[in-house]
Design a protein with these regions (language model features):
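Structural alpha/beta core scaffold segments of enzyme domains
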Residues: 1-268
């Protein structure tokens, strides 16, 4: 309401927004932009009721994107296979450009940037909340001594970005779990045991153990030349646990054949 009123230069009380439940969305969709497009047309075509719909193609082309991320990790291990130092730096754009009252909401509506008197794109400051935005799940759940964790807010990238479900957790967890696999391989250690060696969280431990049991039970059926990859995370280190194993095969033409997925989730 505040964003539409500001963009159309109307009083707040002159704008009535009626919410209608619809399909869910994992983050920031084009719903606010489509609503403003309808209001913008209605202001110029008085005495008409305006029904405006974005097509699926419209939404995929114009909705905010989840931000690209680059993660740089370094780690050291001792002779006992224990991680003794850990550094994780993440570079990314903002995950928050929803129209929020008090934060120049009109500038967060897409069409305001194509009007004759266009708005500048908003510059959002870095989020400082625990596990928010870029640094969501940058803190490893594993027991590392004094991990070094740094986030870098990158500005002036070419695409409009905003919330895509899990925010920075996607990239950060992928980076952490990839690093754990690389370290386990370099040390010639079982990737399950290597993770368990660095976990103090009992629920997390049981989640990983259960996954290993499922994998081991089915291992006799694994096709030749198939590879198995595993990953583990707890969302925001305070919500649900998930352990995942993927069995796949890659042929000489780099074609990937997905064979089986094992998944253990604890959200109790």
């Amino acid at each position: 309401q505040a964003a539409v009123a500001e963009a159309l230069r109307l009083q707040l009380g002159d704008v009535l927004v009626q919410f209608t439940p619809g399909a869910g969305v994992y983050g920031h969709s084009g719903a606010d932009d489509a609503a403003f497009d309808a209001a913008l047309i209605a202001k110029h075509l008085t005495n008409f009721s305006i029904l405006l719909k974005w097509t699926r193609e419209d939404e995929h082309c114009w909705e905010p994107y989840g931000s690209a991320m680059q993660c740089n990790l370094q780690a050291s291990v001792n002779s006992n296979g224990e991680i003794t130092s850990w550094s994780h730096e993440t570079f990314s754009d903002t995950f928050l450009t929803r129209p929020v009252i008090g934060k120049d909401p009109a500038s967060r509506l897409l069409s305001t940037h194509y009007l004759k008197e266009s708005k500048p794109w908003p510059v959002t400051p870095p989020m400082l909340t625990v596990h928010g935005g870029i640094h969501r799940n940058i803190e490893p759940i594993y027991n590392f001594p004094s991990p070094r964790l740094v986030k870098h807010r990158v500005y002036d990238l070419p695409l409009r970005t905003s919330a895509l479900r899990a925010l920075g957790a996607f990239g950060n967890i992928f980076a952490i779990e990839s690093m754990m696999d690389e370290l386990a391989e370099a040390l010639k250690l079982d990737p399950f045991h290597f993770r368990l060696k660095h976990l103090n969280d009992e629920q997390g431990i049981q989640t990983l153990i259960r996954l290993k049991e499922l994998v081991d039970k089915d291992r006799v059926n694994f096709p030749q030349e198939a590879g198995l990859g595993i990953s583990f995370a707890r969302y925001k280190n305070s919500a649900g646990y998930c352990s995942l194993a993927v069995l796949l095969r890659v042929n000489d033409d780099a074609e990937v054949e997905l064979i089986k997925i094992f998944c253990v989730v604890d959200v109790g």
